[in-house]
Amino acid sequence: MIDAYVGLGANLGDRMESLRAAVEQLAREPGFLLRGTSPVYETEPVGPPQPRYLNAVVRIGTLLSPRATLRRLLEIEELLGRVRRERWGAREIDLDLLLYGDRIVADGALRIPHPHLHERAFALIPLAELAPDAYHPQMARTAAELLSTLPEEARQQVRLVGKLRRTLPEPDGGPAGGGSPPAPTDPFPKVC
């Protein structure tokens, strides 16, 4: 099974709920095994003026090919209400395939590692938090090493908001991720 890392982003509607819904959908996918989630960060948008984003990264195990993985991510976006308006525009949900094991893929629209991963704090900070040793095969550096090369100004524009919690039961019927089930109240503050 290959470890793949998926960047999550949302800046329209209930952003936290969009991220949670994406994680739950990824956990339900027959071809994916959810292996971890980063904390959630609020970030400035890249591109035209628009609301701030919430971003996170998840690690999934998969036996699907890189192209099939990307196809499923796009289908999940559509299922969750993604409407493609303009490049780098506001979105209800965005799922980006950041890394797929140590593979390098350049096939049409599919580029792995994600071509801007090494320069974007909103992706590198949650990736390095989740998996500091995740390896970028083109840059020959880990996520933590790449993060250390970003300017301090870029890192300061990314603000920790909280944690994503899976609410789906594990196959054995226990709480997701082990331990106690999540508290019944929402621990995340509303972020505008």
Question: What are the language-model segments listed below?
Answer:
Residues 1-42:
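N-terminal beta1-alpha1 ligand-phosphate binding loop
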Residues 36, 43-54, 64-70, 74-174, ...:
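Flexible, gly/pro- and Lys/Arg-enriched active-site loops
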Residues 179-183:
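Short, low-complexity intrinsically disordered segments enriched in A/P/G/S/L with frequent Arg
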